[in-house]
Amino acid sequence: MHAIEEIKQLTETINEHNHSYYVEDSPSVPDAEYDRLINRLKQLEGENPHLCLPTSPTQRVGGMALAKFDQITHLKPMLSLDNVFSEEEFEAFYKRISDKTSEAPTFCCEPKLDGLAVSILYRDGVYERAATRGDGTTGEDISENVRTILSIPLKLRGDNFPPLLEVRGEVIMPKKAFDALNDRARAKGEKLFVNPRNAAAGSLRQLDSKITASRALGFYAYALGVVEPETWALADTHYDQLMQLRAWGFPVSAEVKQCGDVSSVVAYYTDIMTRRDSLDYEIDGVVIKVDSIEHQGQLGFVAKAPRWATAFKFPAQEEVTLLEGVDFQVGRTGAVTPVARLKPVFVGGVTVSNATLHNADEIARLGVKVGDTVIVRRAGDVIPQIVAIVADKRPDDAREIEFPDTCPVCNSMVERVEGEAVARCTGGLFCEAQRKEAIKHFASRKALDIDGMGDKVVEQLIDKELVESPADLFKLTASAITMLDRMGMKSATNLVAAIEVAKTTTFSRFLYGLGIREVGEATAANLANYFKTLDKLKAADAESFIKVDDVGTIVAQHLTHFFAQPHNLEVVDKLIEAGVNWPEIEEVAEESLSLKGQTWVLTGTLTQLNRNDAKARLQALGAKVAGSVSKNTDCLVAGEAAGSKLTKAQDLGVKVIDEEALLQLLSDSE
């Protein structure tokens, strides 16, 4: 037998044995025979390295360590799920969706795995890449690490699969693997992982994939992502699509079940919760999805979650501990939040020493005092909070919790706006606590987008008193930046250059970067297009602000308060003096808004026009620029390497133009 033929045969045979062992939990050969096969394959590949196949099981051991993870933009956003915490909340969810479907919905239920969500892409049935969920739009490229997970197929089984297939699922660390990992760490005197989820996340995000390969991670598929061509015939229920994934070689939870009505869903939830501790992986609830793909389409999505699915979370775990004190933290928007200092207690898999008390109203509602014995809960198994006090254990020397009248950071007055529960520092950018978060926000990707200006850099700049306001960023020199940890002259020079580039921005990004409460990207764009100039916006009153699209009385109040603060105006003026600028937004008559009422989408790489500039100029002509193609899209601008959005636009009959046509349109409109 020729070497290539034997390599192919061994690769296929060993992958089948791996599937039997890691996916079906049914070993098909003795360990000695498996070892003989794998050693023979290694020998042949060593003698013929040019014949090694990308699907070879020997490629799962990990490769060269990376300097950092690259970013991957998901072909379709990876959305999160809304939660329900009781049978009553689930019944309300059911009523909401049943009113919107053509017939009573049925469900597909599965355990809510407590791991890390990932997207895996296959092209022509062969593993190509994998990414973390990230912010839902962009994730980290963890392709080499995911390749090491033995339960994930490198080549799909069978031959009836689409040319391009995206699979979504959860990477987990089984409880046995977690215990073994901590046993090894304990023997070496190393720090232990607190729970399997943290261990899975830490293992998957190792820059050295060899470390990931040693961690015995597992994977369960829970959904299809992008499938191309879109006309590819798929099952018409979520359950049957999961069974198709299983047939292609993916692990799918054995606990997946179809449920016909509310009572059967609740019974499933109760059963899984009862058996929770006996499962080999950590879960924190069950996921309930409308089973019919047609019904899913009828229900659609809200901003960041599908309407047709929800996570039915288990009751949060609670413990009793002592409230030893209360600290007050100040956030980017000036919110003063009381944080309870607790006698450390193990709750829901982690040691908790702090818990939120939210605000003064919550403190009053609980009637809590320093020195009280309190009940701590991890709400949704994530955020620790105090839910009650044990009144009969209150000591005689228990002390009232006094909310500060002045900011604990800058001593500015603390005020509480009528109708709001949150108290806020009025120091604005003068306040160091707000300053750190404000400068991080100002430099962020959606604001001035200063490349290399990460959170740790900002914190060091402020701690070393090199920067006090956003305007000070533009005074930084390379020699000053080298004072920061891990900043050599080359990195410092690059950062100074990036700051210089960021001086030229857009009015809307500048406004967004100021961090005015409740002024997001869309509102900032509306304000920029309405007022056109900074001077006009600064001179506006609440009545003028309310005339802007999507600006109500509360946002108008935040705007007037911000521009009424002398220190905020001083920062804005210093930014302009430092050279921050943007293209002038010309006055446009209503009849000149040639794209008013239209929805446009940008896709692919634009070579002559910055994407943000293109978006701003389209908005200046009255267009709404959306992130995805639908039947309501009026036009798609397709740059180089346009992908699934272009295909969808063509299928829907949406008008498509290239970058040259866009430039011509913008030129004709000026």
Curated annotation (Swiss-Prot):
Can you name a GO cellular component term?
cytosol
CDD domains recorded for this chain? BRCT_DNA_ligase_like (cd17748), LIGANc (cd00114)
Class of enzymatic activity (EC top level): ligase
The UniProt keywords, alphabetically, are: DNA damage, DNA repair, DNA replication, Ligase, Magnesium, Manganese, Metal-binding, NAD, Zinc
What's its catalytic activity? NAD(+) + (deoxyribonucleotide)n-3'-hydroxyl + 5'-phospho-(deoxyribonucleotide)m = (deoxyribonucleotide)n+m + AMP + beta-nicotinamide D-nucleotide
The GO terms describing molecular function are: DNA ligase (NAD+) activity; metal ion binding
List ligand-binding residues for NAD(+).
Answer: D31, A32, E33, Y34, D35, S80, L81, E110, R133, E170, K289, K313
EC number(s) per entry: 6.5.1.2
Where's the BRCT domain?
590-670
Protein name (Swiss-Prot/TrEMBL): DNA ligase
Can you tell me which family this protein belongs to? Belongs to the NAD-dependent DNA ligase family. LigA subfamily.
Give the matching NCBIfam families: dnlj, PRK07956.1
